[in-house]
Amino acid sequence: SSLSIAMGYNANPLYNYSSYSIFQEPDNSIDVLSIGDSNVYSSIFPLVWWEQQGFTGYTWGQPSQRIPETYEYLKKIYKHQKPSIVLIDGNNLFRDKTDIDNLDSITKAKLATIFPVISFHKNLNPHRLKNIFGNRYSVMKGYYYRKASHKVHKKKHRMKFTRKCWQINKLSASTFSKCIHYCKSQGSIPVLISVPNYNGWNYQKHNALQEIADKNGINFVDLNLELKKQINWKKDSVDGGDHLNIKGAK
């Protein structure tokens, strides 16, 4: 099977090479696009959709991806794909806390779509440059397969109900709205999601994403709540609660 070729690394890659393999897919062949940071490419395994439901998907994600990067990557992806549904992870809305952070991310995002090595300077050796610019087909459809299991040791009420709301920077919110409008203009249905994350998620962030989804007239699906009973944090995480392993993703 395709899974047999996976190595099951324990650490997040500096650069998720398989994301760029979306450009090796036949044009207009992807039904559902998932886009976000390392939580997305660790949690969403598109092959399961194909096996169980018969529709195609691809997961695009880079480590610590910011919302301006999401916007720039969407524009690039839409030159080749017209997905019916776009799942946008909301975790990257919380990374840039100030206007300066946002402006810095916007500049880097525009440059990175033209020169990927600007953002990933540690790849500056012949082998890694080949990974960035070479034509590589991803049998995992962007998913980053990891088999290791490290249980969560923390005991906390991470999803304890509250009406308090996490503050999202206005520039981040504005860029997110641009993502939504762009997806709609291309004929796609954008959906805001949050994937399972024990250590980094809480009800204040849930409330913030629900609020921004309502303002943009889209649905929000919080998998931290939807899959609360299905995820076993003693077995389903690769690193003790930040990212899912293959068992959790399935």
Give short role names for the model-derived ranges:
Residues 238-250:
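Histidine-centered active-site loop/cap adjacent to the catalytic His
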Residues 29-30, 55-56, 82-85, 184-191, ...:
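Loop/turn elements at helix/coil->beta-strand transitions in domains of secreted/extracellular proteins
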Residues 64-68, 168-170, 198-204:
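Acidic-and-aromatic substrate-binding clefts and catalytic sites of carbohydrate-active enzymes
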